């Protein structure tokens, strides 16, 4: 591994939809590309995982029993590939060098995930977008992001959301909701605090990988966090 900081950023698929609620908003892509470029220009190596909820969710697709859960999850994996290609285009348009690596082999579209190759791309200053989740049904893209972060020896995983971090209650419903600046892995799981799913948190805990939850729409926020400024976000760690 290089001596540079290495961060994995996780975006939800819904974030790409903007106010539309579905599909991909190119204005959001352009904004995210600008934030990622700021990280790269400051010498930070970047991996990215994007969910697929702006297109389809495996659980939702399978809820009435017509589509099997495994098939629904495979559809969700393909949705993440669509988002990864869109993000690659936006990042390349901004002048960055980018590679997409998929957990499912699809050579005509992108590389297949190989840990060593991904690390070499990062060392050369390329942004690597990891698509298709873990390649297995029943695992979320949060778990996939945590797994890839560990595999590439990332210093942290940043979960970029629409809110400043994790609250003791839903800030959209309760005006007195309090931002939790620091939480232990154990509390996040025991209190069912919606940071990530329990599998992802447990994996991060076992590998001492900090999870930082932040507002992606605060300009420059990702760079501040990557440089150690956690004043307006939530950090999950031991």
From Swiss-Prot:
Its EC number is 2.7.4.22. ATP binds at residues 10-13, 53, 57, 161, 167, 170. Allosterically activated by GTP. Inhibited by UTP. Keywords: Allosteric enzyme, ATP-binding, Cytoplasm, Kinase, Nucleotide-binding, Pyrimidine biosynthesis, Transferase. UMP binds at residues 52, 73, 134-141. One of its GO terms (cellular component) is cytosol. The keyword Kinase applies. It catalyses: UMP + ATP = UDP + ADP. Residues 18-23 are annotated as: Involved in allosteric activation by GTP. Catalyzes the reversible phosphorylation of UMP to UDP. This is Uridylate kinase. The lineage of its organism: Bacteria, Pseudomonadati, Campylobacterota, Epsilonproteobacteria, Campylobacterales.
């Amino acid at each position: 591994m290089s001596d540079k900081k290495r961060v994995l950023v996780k975006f939800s698929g819904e974030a790409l939809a903007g106010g539309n609620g579905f599909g991909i908003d190119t204005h959001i892509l352009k904004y995210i590309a600008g934030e990622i470029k700021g990280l790269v220009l400051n010498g930070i190596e970047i991996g990215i995982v994007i969910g697929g909820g702006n297109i389809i969710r495996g659980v939702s697709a399978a809820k009435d029993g017509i589509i099997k859960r495994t098939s629904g999850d495979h559809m969700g994996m393909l949705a993440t590939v669509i988002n990864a290609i869109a993000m690659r285009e936006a990042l390349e348009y901004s002048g960055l060098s980018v590679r997409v690596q998929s957990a499912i082999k699809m050579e005509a579209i992108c590389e297949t995930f190989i840990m060593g190759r991904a690390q070499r791309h990062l060392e050369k200053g390329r942004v690597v977008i990891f698509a298709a989740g873990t390649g297995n049904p029943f695992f979320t893209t949060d778990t996939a992001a945590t797994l890839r972060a560990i595999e590439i020896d990332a210093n942290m995983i940043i979960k970029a959301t629409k809110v400043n971090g994790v609250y003791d209650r839903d800030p959209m419903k309760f005006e007195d909701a309090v931002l939790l600046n620091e939480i232990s892995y154990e509390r996040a799981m025991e209190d069912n605090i919606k940071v990530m799913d329990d599998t992802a948190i447990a994996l991060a805990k076992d590998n001492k990988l900090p999870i930082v939850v932040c507002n992606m729409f605060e300009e420059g926020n990702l760079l501040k966090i990557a440089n150690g400024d956690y004043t307006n976000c939530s950090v999950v760690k031991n």
